[in-house]
Amino acid sequence: MRYEERKRAGSGPKSVRRLHLTKCSSRARYLVAFTILLVGAAALAQSLYKYQDENGEWIFTDMPPEDQQAAEIRDLPTGSKPPSVSVSTRIVDREFQFIAKNDYYAPVEVVLALDELTNVRHPTADQVMRWVVDPRSEMILLGLTTTGTDPEPAARFRFMSLFGDPRSRHDPPRPYRAPFPVAASYNITQAYPYGVTHDTADSRYAVDIAMPVGTDIHAARGGIVFEVASTNFRGGTDPDRDAASANIVRILHDDGTHAVYAHLNWNSIRVKPGDTVERGQYIADSGNTGFTSGPHLHFAVLQNVGMRIESVPVVFEGPDSRGIEPAMGQVLTAY
């Protein structure tokens, strides 16, 4: 099923805008406007019902079974606040500074737009208003000279942010490992160029692999985990209701691209942001969460190409380390 990187599966990286009116004094007062990039990892505290349907399939839902059959009831934890990217301002020695803070274990691209400046000199016409902020860091984006104190220097501004460094280039050292146990084989139900629902730039080269709920998912390539959503348990074909309820793992690669593993099972993810994972490492169980018509894994490798996310073609490792291009209807085996 469709997994739009900016809209689907509970929180893909998306451009965000915020309008701020900030006044700063020489005491360097801060007004920090937090911009949440990811939603969906946090869930309200509620009950989970687990039971088997008439076909013996395990059902995870927030509704009790209609026929009064026995069901296991669990309390779901309240999710923690996801990381964020923020831009704040301060005055230091008559310089009006714009500071970006990136809480993620991945770089983010930030674009700043200045709508109104009061007693602050405008940047020069050739000033580039786009930066890449390193993981888990703060960066002074811009420093402008103040021109007075009455009224206090102020700025009205907007910013957008997106995962990834646009200077990155997809350069895997070897074909990707099929993301499930060695010697197992599963059908590819969607792959380029026959994407039934993969019709956006960020999903064009995504691969959907049908597999039973609970199948071990292994990292197709090593890297650093920078986002996890694990508390969702609902799946369905209603985009308004289900789009933001997929469990996912994102892993940053050393070439600046990242992989997303989506529709994972409830409470099955075995990694956390900041973890370094190796190729082939067990990271989660497959599931049927989010916008989906049936159990499968959605796998894609993504790249920031300048405030825009695009998927890139992937090749899986086959026999004798030979590269295999995924195709719809193909049986993929892990080696």
Language-model-detected regions and their locations in the chain:
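Surface-exposed, glycine-biased beta-strand/turn segments
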Residues: V128-S245
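Short hydrophobic beta/alpha edge segments that flank linear recognition/processing sites
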Residues: V249, E278-G290
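Short histidine-centered loop motifs in beta-beta connectors
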Residues: P212, H218, D255-G280
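Acidic, glycine-rich catalytic/binding loops that coordinate metals and/or anionic ligands
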Residues: P173-T189, H218, R241-A244, I269-E278, ...
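Short, cationic interaction patches enriched in Lys/Arg with P/S/T/G and frequent prolines
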Residues: Y3-R6, C24, L44-Q97, D103-I140, ...
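N-terminal secretory signal peptides that target proteins for export/translocation
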Residues: M1-R27
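N-terminal signal peptide c-region/cleavage motif recognized by signal peptidases
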Residues: G40-A42
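Active-site loop architecture of trypsin-fold serine endopeptidases
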Residues: N232-R241, S286-H298
